[in-house]
């Protein structure tokens, strides 16, 4: 049994893949709780797609992919915010238009300028081809985001629940808003190499959704989201070794399965609470 567990660790590429999956899981999990609370799940989706033209342009210009992806992600967020403030359309409609437009522009650029960048690696990542340098860069981003959230999570929480009260309390709403957007963009850049554009959406939504189904206190949700993300990410890479499948989709399948379990468990728990609350008054 122990040999079955340790077999994947005999290969350096598997060790690197598990390491990068854990490193990526931490900032994604922390941010996912805020995204779910604010109703910004589609924002993570939009920014994940929007970085595509940034990656292609970065290749054309000859700059690091991370810079192009970060700028494109911020451009998507700023454009969405501007249109949201200056039009009568709902935010989800605006985000759908912006991210589909930017993703389409990325595809046009990708076809127009032949490059050595593989589309599959951009969309789905290349976790098994991760280098130690990639792990180092991703770890730096993860530490920065974890440190910011660790120091300012109460401010971000108040801004997420009640921006008006946050402003009245002396907090700078604009700084918190765009700071959160910057962290989302940075996290997407970190996930780009490992899980790709498409599958980063799951990492930015599922851990927070699962945690908020199971616990009530915010700090507990943060901790549980991180634990869930690390477990599913590392477990998905390990399981992919035996299933002979790609790690990133396997991770997403684990997240989905765990979400179903969490949903069923929370539904049963809530129904039992309702029955208990109905029995107690009658008994009194």
Question: What is each stretch, according to the model?
Answer:
Residues 1-26, 273-274, 278:
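Membrane-interfacial amphipathic/re-entrant helices at transmembrane-helix boundaries
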Residues 2-16, 87, 94-154:
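Transmembrane helix-bundle core of multi-pass membrane transporters
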Residues 17-20, 65-73, 92-96, 139, ...:
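Loop-to-transmembrane alpha-helix initiation sites
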Residues 33-115, 211-223, 240-243, 267:
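Short loop segments and helix-boundary regions at transmembrane helix junctions
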Residues 50-60, 97-109, 129-130, 173-183, ...:
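Small-residue-rich segments of transmembrane alpha-helices in multi-pass membrane proteins
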Residues 135-207:
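Helix-loop-helix "hairpin" substructures at the membrane interface of multi-pass membrane proteins
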Residues 198-249:
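Transmembrane alpha-helical segments in multi-pass inner-membrane proteins
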Residues 245-284:
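Cytosolic-side transmembrane-helix boundaries in multi-pass membrane proteins
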């Amino acid at each position: 049994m122990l040999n079955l567990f340790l077999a994947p660790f005999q290969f350096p590429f598997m060790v690197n893949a598990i390491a990068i999956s854990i490193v990526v899981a931490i900032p994604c999990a922390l941010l996912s709780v805020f995204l779910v609370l604010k109703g910004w799940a589609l924002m993570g989706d939009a920014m994940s797609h929007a970085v595509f033209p940034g990656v292609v342009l970065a290749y054309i210009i000859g700059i690091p992919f991370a810079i192009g992806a970060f700028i494109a992600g911020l451009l998507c967020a700023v454009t969405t915010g501007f249109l949201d403030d200056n039009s009568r359309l709902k935010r989800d409609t605006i985000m759908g238009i912006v991210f589909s437009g930017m993703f389409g522009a990325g595809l046009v650029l990708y076809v127009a300028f032949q490059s050595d960048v593989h589309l599959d690696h951009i969309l789905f990542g290349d976790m098994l081809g991760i280098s130690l340098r990639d792990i180092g860069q991703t770890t730096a981003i993860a530490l920065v985001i974890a440190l910011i959230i660790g120091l300012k999570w109460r401010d971000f929480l108040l801004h997420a629940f009640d921006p008006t009260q946050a402003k009245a309390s002396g907090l700078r709403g604009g700084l918190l808003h765009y700071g959160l957007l910057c962290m989302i963009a940075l996290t997407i850049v970190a996930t780009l190499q490992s899980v790709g554009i498409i599958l980063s959406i799951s990492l930015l939504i599922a851990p927070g959704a699962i945690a908020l189904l199971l616990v009530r206190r915010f700090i507990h949700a943060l901790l549980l989201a991180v634990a869930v993300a690390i477990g599913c990410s590392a477990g998905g890479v390990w399981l992919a070794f035996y299933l002979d499948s790609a790690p990133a989709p396997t991770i997403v399948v684990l997240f989905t399965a765990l979400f179903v379990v969490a949903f069923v468990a929370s539904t049963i728990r809530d129904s039992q609470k309702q029955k208990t609350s109905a029995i107690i008054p009658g008994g009194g």
